[in-house]
């Protein structure tokens, strides 16, 4: 239901980054094609949309964590790992970093706004 109502609004306003929780895992979408993938979790049906430039992240910081079945719908996964995020803005660039509870960098990407074009997703090498 949330996807049905929120996704069109997020697309209309070209939202850069969607942060959510309550899945008890860490997962982040990336530049992937989800049109032919089966059994995609609810929050990832549209994953990263290169025509819009939205990235979706779900994270966990509490003690309750689940194992995850890795799928093609997310670029980066973590299970049984508490994470926190730091987001920096510098002009037209959003930098996202996810760290483990012990301070180890786990995930990083940048979103670069481009006038008249979708955001450019710049992946860090892991």
Which ranges hold each PLM region?
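C-terminal domain-boundary segment and adjacent tail
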Residues: 86, 95-126
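Long, structured stretches of catalytic cores involved in phosphate-ester chemistry, encompassing
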Residues: 1-105
């Amino acid at each position: 239901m949330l996807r049905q109502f929120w996704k069109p609004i997020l697309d209309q306003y070209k939202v850069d980054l969607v942060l959510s929780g309550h899945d008890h895992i860490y997962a982040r979408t990336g530049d992937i094609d989800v049109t032919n993938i089966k059994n995609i979790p609810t929050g990832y049906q549209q994953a990263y949309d290169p025509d819009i430039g939205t990235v979706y992240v779900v994270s966990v910081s509490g003690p309750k964590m689940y194992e995850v079945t890795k799928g093609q719908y997310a670029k980066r996964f973590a299970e049984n790992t508490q994470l926190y995020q730091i987001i920096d803005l510098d002009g037209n660039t959003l930098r996202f970093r996810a760290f483990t509870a012990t301070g180890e960098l786990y995930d990083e990407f940048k979103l670069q706004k481009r006038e008249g074009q979708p955001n450019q997703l710049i992946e860090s090498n892991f």
